[in-house]
Swiss-Prot record:
Keywords of this entry: Elongation factor, Protein biosynthesis
Name of the protein in question: Elongation factor 1-beta
Task of the protein: Promotes the exchange of GDP for GTP in EF-1-alpha/GDP, thus allowing the regeneration of EF-1-alpha/GTP that could then be used to form the ternary complex EF-1-alpha/GTP/AAtRNA.
Superkingdom to which the source organism belongs: Archaea
CDD domains for the chain: EF1B
Signal peptide span: none
Similarity field: Belongs to the EF-1-beta/EF-1-delta family.
Listed GO MF terms: translation elongation factor activity
Keyword Transmembrane: no
HAMAP family to which the protein is assigned, alphabetical: EF1_beta (MF_00043)
Length: 89
């Protein structure tokens, strides 16, 4: 088995959500079997709302990004979690 790079979009609950604090919360819940690749990037959406883009390297095993998606979804201030891309490296 190899590794997979996954780009995940995390939508905050509102424009008022403190993105710096949310980034720290996201970093704190990254599962042990996943590694953060690069920085967490802010992506403008509309009307001042910004999404966070997280790139993770995970092992290509059953479940893949699910543990990370579930952990991110449980973070206070997160509205939605979506895998944008996933590919073998």
């Amino acid at each position: 088995m190899g590794d997979v790079a996954a780009k995940i979009k995390i939508m905050p609950e509102s424009i008022e959500t403190d993105l710096a604090e949310l980034k720290e919360k996201i970093k704190a819940v990254i599962p042990a079997k996943a590694d953060l690749h690069g920085d967490i990037v802010e992506e403008p959406i509309a009307f001042g709302l910004k999404a966070l883009i997280v790139t993770l390297i995970v092992n290509d095993e059953e479940g893949g990004t699910e543990p990370a998606e579930e952990a991110f979804a449980k973070v206070s201030g997160v509205e939605n979690v979506q895998v944008l891309e996933a590919y073998r490296i």
